[in-house]
UniProtKB/Swiss-Prot annotation:
Pathway: Fermentation; pyruvate fermentation to lactate; (S)-lactate from pyruvate: step 1/1. It comes from the Bacteria. It comes from Thermoanaerobacterium saccharolyticum (strain DSM 8691 / JW/SL-YS485). Allosterically activated by fructose 1,6-bisphosphate (FBP). The keyword Cell membrane does not apply. Homotetramer. This is L-lactate dehydrogenase. Substrate binds at residues 80, 86, 118-121, 146-149, 228.
Amino acid sequence: MSKVAIIGSGFVGATSAFTLALSGTVTDIVLVDLNKDKAIGDALDISHGIPLIQPVNVYAGDYKDVKGADVIVVTAGAAQKPGETRLDLVKKNTAIFKSMIPELLKYNDKAIYLIVTNPVDILTYVTYKISGLPWGRVFGSGTVLDSSRFRYLLSKHCNIDPRNVHGRIIGEHGDTEFAAWSITNISGISFNEYCSICGRVCNTNFRKEVEEEVVNAAYKIIDKKGATYYAVAVAVRRIVECILRDENSILTVSSPLNGQYGVKDVSLSLPSIVGRNGVARILDLPLSDEEVEKFRHSASVMADVIKQLDI
């Protein structure tokens, strides 16, 4: 038996439920949303395809139905309105989380809490602070999606299977994120060397263009279709699978830091071992001096926001 509760049945929540239903790793999925009819409709829509896949029980519920869930995926939150600043949105969602998280904990304080709502790094830290849950049991989807975008772009550049591209986007899931080029490789061959062997461009301008494309990917998609949800739902599925299967896989999830690269009291993404008990350990990467400074800058930006929150 494996149960996942998804809080928020919007684009991301509903699509995550769909990808998890297809995964075959979950026996029960409950969708919880203030708009109960939306959750009921999404659950029915997914359920009508169950005869064609592995059996899974998908249904709509309330906070009390998170009881017994192995993983609670939080996608609920306010959307940014025209003219609203990022800080306004952060404060609004922090208020929502301060009300919602204690309600969830009433019914389940044993689950892994996976935060997906943006700004994910801030809300992961907010959840960690107000929940009182042990370190590792609360973390965010972080830059798992960004790293996937990065690998995809490099695979297209090199005409290679993206699964053979090993690269990480670290730091904030947002404007200050960056690629850890110093450890990027293709099947063990450094990216620089691989490009040299294959006659591919790998200069400073190319790297800058790739990073900018990763950072701006969501903006581009939102401009075209209004929202992003397919790829992030695949990222959610991958993280949940790592937990339920106790894979101890390495993913760039966002966790509260406790001294990595001189940073603490914020949540940021670094490659981390993820298994049945959540995040087991954050890996210490051999970053370049420039990358360490970029990471610290990302942390500083997050810390400035956190200082303005009432948590």
